[in-house]
Structure formats: structure tokens, C-alpha cells
Amino acid sequence: MAFQAVCILVGVFVCSTYVKGSPQPQARVYLTFDELRETKTSEYFSLSQYPLDYRILLMDEDQDRMYVGSKDHILSLNINNISQEPLSVFWPASAIKVEECKMAGKDPTHGCGNFVRVIQAFNRTHLYVCGSGAFSPVCAYLNRGRRSEDQVFMIDSKCESGKGRCSFNPNVNTVSVMINEELFSGMYIDFMGTDAAIFRSLTKRNAVRTDQHNSKWLSEPMFVDAHVIPDGTDPNDAKVYFFFKEKLTDNSRSTKQIHSMIARICPNDTGGLRSLVNKWTTFLKARLVCSVTDEDGPETHFDELEDVFLLEMDNPRTTLVYGIFTTSSSVFKGSAVCVYHFSDIQTVFNGPFAHKEGPNHQLISYQGRIPYPRPGTCPGGAFTPNMRTTKEFPDDVVTFIRNHPLMYNSIYPVHRRPLIVRIGTDYKYTKIAVDRVNAADGTYNVLFLGTDRGTVQKVVVLPTNSSARSELILEELEVFKNHAPITTMKISSKKQQLYVSSNEGLAQVSLHRCHIYGSACADCCLARDPYCAWDGHSCSRFYPTGKRRSRRQDVRHGNPLTQCRGFNLKAYRNAAEIVQYGVKNNTTFLECAPKSPQASIKWLLQKDKDRRKEVKLNERIIATSQGLLIRSVQDSDQGLYHCIATENSFKQTIAKINFKVLDSEMVAVVTDKWSPWTWASSVRALPFHPKDIMGAFSHSEMQMINQYCKDTRQQHQQGEESQKMRGDYGKLKALINSRKSRNRRNQLPES
């Protein structure tokens, strides 16, 4: 216990040190749900006012369709506009199964329904779909037609058992891929949720699964994703990779730790001949590490893998694997993004195997003889051209795989540290999608990060040197009004659209909305959005061309001074002057909110025609993110205030406020409800407009004025003579005239 306590304290110290050294960045632009809708760059869809647990399970860009699974429904939506009327199939669980589910004590709302979790393209005309079936999984073939114009969408086969293809519990994730009309699934195969398996079904060959109840293979896994990735030029060497997290017991067998893992199998694996019959003989797994390392050495791990995105390149070895990780500690909560080179993953799987002498021993690198062909090699591939099937593998290869499925080395991210870390925030990342964008000054990987509060952050990470990174949150969007956590996310670079789901509905968001950054070249340049550039008239979508000088863009530095010459930068820096009044000894607020929270603010004060001087901040004068708070206003506070914003060394005047101080005694007379004043009706004779004074009043004073005006209107409506409203004009006039020498502009006209 003492050792665990020390580890927890060390972890907290490492994370707090990391946060202290790296302040959490803010989004440069934040759009609420309503503001996002006003940009006309988003669409929203919901089948019902009730939560239906939507999951985007398949994208077909060739037919412009997106297939969504939900509770009792399968949807086909137009990816050009998801708000259009969808094609849908109502596919509930049978009444008998629903009743049995309820009798078993399962949740009637979130468990006893048919939650669709598998949608895979079986062939050109049919989808293969599976649902939880009220804790009795079912599957069927769904006819979608040969073309999207056919408007065909119906289940045209009898339902069959989904056991081994879809989890019983809809709250337990199911992952799957379809290869040559064979389904590869990661799920739980039983009602109680104790038998996890990676399973191949729908096959003309024998069904194959992981070794049952063997914790060396799978230990209470929670599946995250699955992908088919080529391995070299021979198609027989391609492998299916499963990403998951699992609970592993330590040597003391008293506690369980969560580790993120990646496993792989060969699609053409048919199991062993005498051992591992109908079991994978090519199953290997390795640990995925995403951690922060302190200068003194200790690592703080983000243990729980939440989502995976593969950014594919022309060469599969250069594919980038992005992962969302969260902490499992109850002491601190956070999330991180780690990115891995696929070549590093291959290196680990080609490296040493892990070995354990006994239950109380540590893992070591296996030092014995490695059988041939190397365990994990696919039959018929580049290294085993003469072996047509895994049943031809020697017995020692099969035995070795059964006892040594784990690789000794762990897989570390690029530069052995996270790309992005979030600790101490009120949200955690849940989903990720990445787009590769060509800009004027290079190529950037733009990250779209979904959160558990229903927002999407658009982030670009800029390289500064071989190891350091500088991240920019370009924008954060509320894609769901009720802040529902994001459950799935798909991206279409072809359509330049992002598709997001939650328990409540579906959202479609454009990857860019350049016009929101502003109407000036400097605004566009400061945004540093790889999708956007200044075209000489507006901030618009950037398209790489040979004429670079006609498009102004600087993602790496965002410097308007070099990019916006000739676009009247001097005029852009000047803000319109406004007049604001404050009452002596009261509190006032000078508002100045920059467009970007990433800008630093400086306040300058100019009195009469003197030079501008920086405002000295103290307990009385306080700078906030929204402006300058002046407590107990003094005569010396009067003058012209300049609010200067600096971003990327570019300075601009956000606000000019001509601040005038009013005497508290004068304002007291004006607002005395027992001394109503008639001279205020002579607006043209006043040296200032009454509305100007109103801006200086506190909330309580404004309430008094509002009540006075209400009483005045009522008396006028009753036809009373205006003579009864005269009030103590003489007292006010005397008070102001006594201050003529100090400020003659406050003198009222003679009556």
C-alpha cells in the first residue's frame, strides 16, 4: 500500500509539473451550437426526440451514403446533407426476447432493445448487419441496391444468430471488419460477458477464435477498433489488427492494471492441426504506451485507449496510427493523443517475445530457440511461400504461440511522448479523426478531437524542432446542443465534411468555415488555418496552385506583417473611439474582448495631449480577459484608453475608450427620485446626452431611474400638468456651476 501511495503521488507530481510547464491552450474561436448553425456549415439529424444511441458504422463515399446503427433502427443517410429524409429499416428485437431480457434484470431502456453494432459491406448490393437483440444477438443481410438512386433499403433474409459476431450487451463495444465475405469480430460471445474472443465467421472454411479463457491471450478486454493493414507487397502477408485495452493482474494478484494493447492475426489462419484446433495460430499482441516522462525518469501513463484513427499513406509502412488515451487513476483525470509510426509497430512484432518463468516472476525477453517459421508469420506469404495453410505449421510453432503471444518490447509513440496532453480540464477526448492538408508553407495533419461534452476541437500541431511541438486549437464547435458525449466520428476528405454521432443525434460539419475569422487580411493570417487563405478580397478556402503570391497564408508563423503588405494594415490597426462615463468612487468596467484568447492585452492611457503610458495595474485597477476593471474611480483615471492586442508579434488596437469621470454628488442629485428634473426633456440644450450618463450608473442606480421613468409615464398618462414635475433644478444647477472652473463642459443652460 505504501508503495502504491508513493506511485500515485509521483504520478500526480509528474502531471502537475507537466501542466505547470505547459499551460492548457484555449480555442482561438469557440462557436456555440446556435452560432455554428448561423455559419451555414453544419447539419443536424435525429430520428426521434428520444435518445436512440446513434453509431456511424460505415461510410460509402462512392455511393454518397452513410450507414448508421441505433436502437431498433438502421439508417442510410446522404453524406452530402444528412438532414435530408433518410432511408431506414425498423428492426426491433422480438417481443419474446425483450420480455426475457427484462426478466433477467437488464435495463429495459438501455439494454432490452436491438442496438445495431455491426454494419459491413458484404458485396456490391448487400450489407451484413448485426444487433444486440435484447441480449440475444441477431444478424441479417440488408439489400441496399446496386446504386444509391435505386432507393432500395430492406432486410431480405431471415435473421440468424449473432453469437460470435456481436456482443450480447450493447454497452460492451463490438469491433469488426469484412474481408472477402468473411467477418472478423472482437466481442464477448456469451450472455454473462465473461468469454471475450476475436472470431472469424461467415466463412466457407472453419470458424476460428482466440484461445478460450486464456488470460495470456485476452484478459477482460474492451475492444476499441479493428483494421486491415498490408504488410509488404504480398497480399497473403496482410494482417488484421485489433486495438483494445485489458485488465492485467500484477505479480501479487491483488490488483489489476489497465493496459492498452494491439493484437494481430492472419486472415488466412485456419488453426492448428493437432493443437489450437479452430484457434488462431498467428495471434500476437503488444502493449501500446502513451505516457509523460518527468526529467527525473518516472512515467505517468495514460492507460485507457479510447479511439484509434489510421492516417494512410502511399506506403503502408509510413501509415500513422493516432490514438486517444485517458487516465485510469482516480487521483487525477486527463486525456492525451499519441501517434505511432506503423513501421515501429512492425518492428516490435518482429522483435523478442516476452517470457515468464512462473506466476510470481517478472516478464523477460525469451532467450531460447525461436521455431521456424517465425511465430506470427502468415502462410503463403513472402517468408512461407510453400506453406498453403497454418495446419502445415510444425507443432513447436503452434505450441510457442499458445504460450508466448505477448511481445517483450512495448510500442512507444513518436518522440516517446504524447502529441497532445490535457490535464485539469473540464472535458476528456473521446474520438479522433485526422485530415492531411496541403498549405502554402507545407503539409499539415489537422486533428479533429471529439469530447465528452459534445464539442469538436480542430487542432494543428506545428513542428518547431526535432522533438518539440507547438499546438494550436483553431476552433472548438458545439456540434450538439445538449453537450452529449461524442460516440463515433468519421471524416471525408473527399467531401470536406466531418460526421459525428451521440446518443441524441447526428451532426455534419464542414472541415472549414474561413469567413468566420474576419473580413481583413490580418484576421485570416492570424487564424493560421491550413484550409484558409486571403484571396485579396476575403478569407476563403485555400487551393494549392502555382500562383502562390495571389494567396496569402502563413500557418507556421501567422505573421500578417509579411503576408498582408498592401492591404491597409495601418487602417486596420485603428479602432473607433467611444465615450464612456464613470462615477467617482464607484466601480466601472472598460470592455475590450479580443477575437482571439491567444492574444495578449496591454492597456495604454493618454491624458490630454500627453504621450500614451502603460496603465499600472494594482488592487484598484485590474485587467481581466474581457476588459479593465477600475474600482473606486478617481479623477486621475480620466483620459483616452487604448486596448492593444498582440498576437504573433502583430499589434492592433481593439478599443479606444474616452473615459470621463462624473462627480458622485452631481449624479446623486440627478438620480434622486424625490427630486424629479424637467430640464432633461431639453435634450438639445444639454452639453451631453442623458443616455451617456446612464452608462455610468450601477445596477441599483439604474433600477431607481427605471422606476422614476415608470412613475413619470404614468403621471403623464393621467393628464397631470408638467409643472408638478419640476423638481429641484436650482440645487443641481448650483452644484454644477460650483465646478465650472474644473470642467466647463458640464455647465447647464440658463432657464
Swiss-Prot record:
Phylogenetic lineage: Eukaryota, Metazoa, Chordata, Craniata, Vertebrata
Pfam families given in the database record: I-set, Sema
SMART domains: IG (SM00409), PSI (SM00423), Sema (SM00630)
Protein's recorded name: Semaphorin-3C
Glycosylated residues (UniProt): N81, N123, N268, N465, N585, N586
UniProt domain Sema: residue ranges: 28-511
Disulfide bonds: C101-C112, C130-C139, C266-C378, C290-C338, C514-C532, C592-C643
SUPFAM superfamilies: Immunoglobulin, Plexin repeat, Sema domain
GO molecular function: chemorepellent activity; neuropilin binding; semaphorin receptor binding
A cellular component annotation (GO) from this entry: extracellular space
Ranges of residues in domain Ig-like C2-type: 571-655
Species this protein is from: Bos taurus (Bovine)
Segments for region (Disordered): 712-751
Family annotation (Gene3D superfamilies): Immunoglobulins, ligand-binding face of the semaphorins, domain 2, YVTN repeat-like/Quinoprotein amine dehydrogenase
InterPro entries (alphabetical): Ig-like_dom, Ig-like_dom_sf, Ig-like_fold, Ig_I-set, Ig_sub, PSI, Semap_dom, Semap_dom_sf
Highest taxon above the source species: Eukaryota
Family to which the UniProt record says this protein belongs: Belongs to the semaphorin family.
General function of this protein: Binds to plexin family members and plays an important role in the regulation of developmental processes. Required for normal cardiovascular development during embryogenesis. Functions as attractant for growing axons, and thereby plays an important role in axon growth and axon guidance.
Biological process terms in GO annotation: axon guidance; blood vessel remodeling; cardiac endothelial to mesenchymal transition; cardiac right ventricle morphogenesis; dichotomous subdivision of terminal units involved in salivary gland branching; limb bud formation; negative chemotaxis; neural crest cell migration
Basic and acidic residues: bias regions: 712-731
